[in-house]
A protein has these predicted regions:
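Conserved Rossmann-fold NAD(P)-dependent oxidoreductase catalytic core, especially the SDR/UDP-sugar
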Residues: 87, 91-150, 155, 165
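Conserved Rossmann-fold cofactor-binding substructure of NAD(P)-dependent oxidoreductases
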Residues: 63-84
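Rossmann-fold scaffold of SDR-type NAD(P)-dependent oxidoreductases
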Residues: 12, 79-88, 129
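Residues in the short beta-alpha loop(s) of Rossmann-like NAD(P)-binding domains
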Residues: 40, 50, 133, 233
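Conserved residues in the N-terminal Rossmann fold of short-chain dehydrogenase/reductase
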Residues: 38, 65-66, 106, 198, ...
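N-terminal Rossmann NAD(P)H-binding glycine-rich loop of SDR-like oxidoreductase domains
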Residues: 7-29
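Conserved glycine-rich Rossmann-like NAD(P)H-binding loop of the short-chain dehydrogenase/reductase
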Residues: 30-43
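Strand-loop microenvironment adjacent to phosphate/nucleotide-handling motifs in alpha/beta enzyme folds
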Residues: 121, 151-344
Length: 344
């Protein structure tokens, strides 16, 4: 963590699952300060108390700022003296955003513009924006708003001066707040059938630790305007549900199919065909550099570029699909799953 030695890191939306994992990983390093910027004072108070109890020797490194990414001034006020930002604040529930799309616009698009405007004005060194696979070929309000969030970030990077701006894009983060596995476990423990939208639906899966790894990789290796993704595996929702049933004593014959919700797709895409054309393979990651052409297109009519990669699209159907035992093994790596199993 030498890059963070003595530095001040700010996490927008920092009381969520991502922020908690960052704190657990960073607090006992040589980082100087971590600022949690969010609008929910109750969650901030709960987080403050939790870390004072669990990690009292380093809890004073955490500073809490109540504010909203929708408010530019509160962003600026919280950023005085900040070196780096992980921008995680977002509305991310697909059905909710379908019913309230303008709220997604205010938080995911305008909020991101505010964060980046404030970061550039305050001389922040680097901002990593967290995005989602739903931003690729978006069909729902949440995905469309996150796609525009990425566009805002890339546009800002062209005029960001010393501030490096990168985006990360990833799929379903297992056991994060609002995700499906905790719901299934609760349903099993209550003696109810577990509800599945569509068994044949596929989704990328990764752990919260891997989500943080991706952000740190982007921070260390990304260039201004880059989009970075991790080569995540995927699984079918039906097989994942069966795995949870077998791990927690549920009856897989009681799985109840309820149908696809508002705005959902049968599979998700991490890299579109167009992005694959210029993607750089970095082993466990792909990097998509920003299109740094200007608005003067005359020269491009004369001097084209026919080079492109063989990869045509990276989605949850053509990545590595995990079998049931592999799904179980991946879930068993999670502290949350270990804790829920220990309840019995």
């Amino acid at each position: 963590m030498s890059l963070f030695k003595g530095k001040t890191l700010m996490i927008t939306g920092g009381t969520g699952s991502f922020g908690n994992v960052v704190l657990n990983r960073f607090l006992q390093t040589d980082i100087g300060e971590i600022r949690i910027f969010s609008r929910d004072e109750k969650k901030q108070d709960d987080m403050r108390h939790d870390f004072q109890v669990r990690m009292p020797e380093v809890a004073d490194k955490i500073k809490f700022y109540i504010g909203d990414v929708r408010d530019l001034q509160s962003c600026k006020s919280a950023m005085h003296g900040v070196d780096y930002i992980f921008h995680a604040a977002a509305l991310k529930q697909v059905p909710s955003c379908e019913f309230f799309p303008m709220e997604a616009v205010k938080t995911n698009i305008i909020g991101t513009d505010n964060v980046l405007t404030a970061a550039i004005e305050e001389g922040v060194e680097a901002v990593i924006c967290l995005s989602t696979d739903k931003a690729a070929y978006p069909i729902n309000a949440m995905g469309k708003s996150k796609s525009l969030e990425e566009s805002v970030a890339i546009a800002k990077s062209r005029y960001s001066g010393k501030t490096k701006i990168c985006c990360t894009r990833y799929g379903n983060v297992m056991c994060s707040r609002g995700s499906v596995i905790p719901l299934w476990i609760d349903q099993i423990k209550a003696g109810n059938p577990i509800t599945v939208t569509e068994p044949n639906m596929t989704r990328f899966i990764m752990s919260l630790e891997e989500a943080v790894d991706l952000v740190l990789y982007a921070f260390e290796h990304g260039e201004n305007g880059d989009l970075l993704i991790m080569k995540a595996p995927a699984c079918s929702i039906g097989l994942q549900a069966e795995a949870v049933c077998e791990m927690f004593g549920g009856n897989k014959d009681d799985i109840k199919v309820i149908g696809i919700r508002h705005g959902e797709k049968m599979y998700e895409t991490l890299l579109t065909n167009e992005e694959c054309a210029k993607a750089v393979d970095l082993g466990d990651f792909y990097r998509v550099p920003a299109d740094n052409r200007g608005l003067n297109y005359d020269k491009y009519f004369k001097d084209g570029d026919v080079k492109r990669n063989k990869l045509t699209e990276f989605n949850s159907n053509n990545t590595k699909l995990l079998n049931k035992e592999e799904i179980k093994a991946k879930m068993m790596e999670l502290t949350y799953i270990q804790g829920r199993l220990a309840e019995d």
